[in-house]
Amino acid sequence: MAWLVLSGILLCMLGAGLGTSDLEDVLPPAPHNCPDICICAADVLSCAGRGLQDLPVALPTTAAELDLSHNALKRLHPGWLAPLSRLRALHLGYNKLEVLGHGAFTNASGLRTLDLSSNMLRMLHTHDLDGLEELEKLLLFNNSLMHLDLDAFQGLRMLSHLYLSCNELSSFSFNHLHGLGLTRLRTLDLSSNWLKHISIPELAALPTYLKNRLYLHNNPLPCDCSLYHLLRRWHQRGLSALHDFEREYTCLVFKVSESRVRFFEHSRVFKNCSVAAAPGLELPEEQLHAQVGQSLRLFCNTSVPATRVAWVSPKNELLVAPASQDGSIAVLADGSLAIGRVQEQHAGVFVCLASGPRLHHNQTLEYNVSVQKARPEPETFNTGFTTLLGCIVGLVLVLLYLFAPPCRGCCHCCQRACRNRCWPRASSPLQELSAQSSMLSTTPPDAPSRKASVHKHVVFLEPGKKGLNGRVQLAVAEDFDLCNPMGLQLKAGSESASSTGSEGLVMS
């Protein structure tokens, strides 16, 4: 009995062991190096809202997007992103970062988007963003930034969107852009800061593609006439930054915050501004017209020779020597831009960017190129000529009908046809008597009867001939035209029809 109990216990233990092994084989394995407090999904790693005070360790190397927002991170360790060679987007918003430190983004050259918004950053030093050569979008809004080093963004050659709104910046260098340059930058948000002074010449020298998305609203700017004329011109040109936030552009009439008024709704504040001060602030773009297939050359003429020249196409493509990507545009050694054969895709604004040590600030020149299709050749036989020819032919036919005599053969045919249809071959005595009475009657017939009778034959009495059997002989004139009964005339003779009638008419 004891042997049987021991055997049963051993079998149960063996079955339990086999069941555990099978269960482990069914469950999916945990993701490779995924922290327990994070969520890993393919190449996305989310550690948001976990209350982290320090960076997690042993992150998966396959991550292309890392979300560490809504935590309590206070600092970033140098080189902490080195294992993440595939990282393209890093979200660090809503933390407690006060400084970035040198080397925080070393080995993150593949990063395209960096979100540092809603932190506690107060300064941005020259080397804080080293290693981000391919960065395209940088979000620094809703911090406490009060100062930017002159070269704070040096090395971010691919940066196109920079958001610095909702900070405490009191100045910004539009000439140097703190190391950014103008070749790639398309969006610059400086709204809701403490900007009290802006260099108007530097602002006017910016290219149009940057002015279009340069946000300066909600700043305590002074109500300056030059600034008013410049922003007014941008508003009239329909730049989106002015159009979208028209009511948010304000200025201070006095040096107190309570004197803030809206730029475009209180124009009476600027009624004493001279309009003559407006020209010269901003150079107008030069208008050029070209036809498809023509050659075009644009020159970047600056006040002094420039050492570096670059162009921006209407498609926001940076053009430097030797040529564009499609090969249709070439940048020559002297800095000019040449288009061999103009096409419709070349229509738009070309911007020349010139810089150099002898230039006080970067200069930009703009060319608005309008491309027109070649005019088609005029038609050799148009509708107007056809109409004129038809009128001439019609006039010739009318003149021939009026003045050309008809052919004799046609007249004989007409007379034969009319003789057969219009005049009977033998008339009865009753018909002759009716003709006499209608001719010699002194009372004209009624108007309706006259209108109804269309074919009337004129008859007359021949003088010198007596009536036969008590009747007057009626004769038709020898020149009686059977084809034209309306044009008949009485036969001329020595005696009139009245005297003929005096010989006496026998009526039955």
From Swiss-Prot:
Ubiquitous. Residues 25-61 form the LRRNT domain. The keyword Transmembrane applies. One of its GO terms (cellular component) is membrane. LRR repeats lie at residues 62-83, 86-107, 110-133, 134-155, 158-178, 184-207. SMART domains: IG, LRR_TYP. InterPro entries: AMIGO, Ig-like_dom, Ig-like_dom_sf, Ig-like_fold, Ig_sub, Leu-rich_rpt, Leu-rich_rpt_typical-subtyp, LRR_dom_sf. It is found in: Membrane. Residues 1-19 form the signal peptide. Residues 279-370 form the Ig-like C2-type domain. It comes from the Eukaryota. One of its GO terms (biological process) is heterophilic cell-cell adhesion via plasma membrane cell adhesion molecules. Pfam families: LRR_1, LRR_8. Disulfide bonds join C34-C40, C38-C47, C223-C251, C225-C273, C300-C352. One of its GO terms (molecular function) is protein-containing complex binding. Residues 405-508 are cytoplasmic. The chain crosses the membrane at residues 384-404. Residues 20-383 are extracellular. Belongs to the immunoglobulin superfamily. AMIGO family. May mediate heterophilic cell-cell interaction. May contribute to signal transduction through its intracellular domain. This is Amphoterin-induced protein 3. It comes from Mus musculus (Mouse). The gene is Amigo3.
